[in-house]
Amino acid sequence: MKKLKLHGFNNLTKSLSFCIYDICYAKTAEERDGYIAYIDELYNANRLTEILSETCSIIGANILNIARQDYEPQGASVTILVSEEPVDPKLIDQTKHPGPLPETVVAHLDKSHICVHTYPESHPEGGLCTFRADIEVSTCGVISPLKALNYLIHQLESDIVTIDYRVRGFTRDVNGMKHFIDHEINSIQNFMSEDMKSLYDMVDVNVYQENIFHTKMLLKEFDLKHYMFHTKPEDLTETERQEITAALWKEMREIYYGRNISAV
């Protein structure tokens, strides 16, 4: 897409939001409580603040304000307001390609916010526990938050990821014509690295005329030992391993597809 010569400030709002899910099997009530306590401490408000603050530092954003809160019995949230450092719009790369990895990120945000909320969850029957983190990066100006996508997913790799990207509003060029998007995009996957795409099965649901893009990601490899909390697969019978594997895989598919699946 040819670079636009705008009249005044770029008034487009670009919002990137995604949910990450971590799934675990905890055999007993004590193990379930232990997992919830572990994941709640791992992603408490202070830890989330460190992650988001480091994100701001990497992308070159100025932190204006931080609001954070831990909740009882579990969960946390952090919201950071940031502003952009001076940047020449002509120097901004608007091409579609995977965002850089953490060690190479250099970018700017403008009058923007980054927020995260966590939702640990378990049920007394079945042994399944889930952890969900909602993250949103919203910007106004020439910068797309998609540039931060690759870094954030690398930081928060999980079993399932759902991503939404939307461009709202319009901006005008020097001739007064309105533009409702200022960069080319046909899939969020264009902004992911090849190694990231190789780890997940992905599907897109896009509404191009509304500038709405959606991608769902499900981890390809399944190894039971990575889903057990304080229990080793080798300590279980073959029947138990098969039953737990089936329960975990069903849980992951239900979250991925967003609907309950009947047992076969």
UniProtKB/Swiss-Prot annotation:
Cofactor stoichiometry and binding remark: Binds 1 pyruvoyl group covalently per subunit.
Pfam families named in the record: AdoMet_dc
EC number: 4.1.1.50
Modification comment: Is synthesized initially as an inactive proenzyme. Formation of the active enzyme involves a self-maturation process in which the active site pyruvoyl group is generated from an internal serine residue via an autocatalytic post-translational modification. Two non-identical subunits are generated from the proenzyme in this reaction, and the pyruvate is formed at the N-terminus of the alpha chain, which is derived from the carboxyl end of the proenzyme.
Entries under InterPro entries matching the protein: AdoMetDC_fam_prok, S-AdoMet_deCO2ase_bac, S-AdoMet_deCO2ase_core
GO molecular function, one term: adenosylmethionine decarboxylase activity
Catalytic activity reported: S-adenosyl-L-methionine + H(+) = S-adenosyl 3-(methylsulfanyl)propylamine + CO2
EC category name: lyase
Record-annotated active site: 112, 117, 140
Entry superkingdom: Bacteria
A GO cellular-component term linked to this record: cytosol
Gene Ontology BP term (one): spermidine biosynthetic process
Family of the protein in this entry: Belongs to the prokaryotic AdoMetDC family. Type 2 subfamily.
HAMAP family given in the database record: AdoMetDC_2
Subunit structure: Heterooctamer of four alpha and four beta chains arranged as a tetramer of alpha/beta heterodimers.
Protein name (record): S-adenosylmethionine decarboxylase proenzyme
Organism: Salmonella choleraesuis (strain SC-B67)
Gene name of the encoded protein: speD
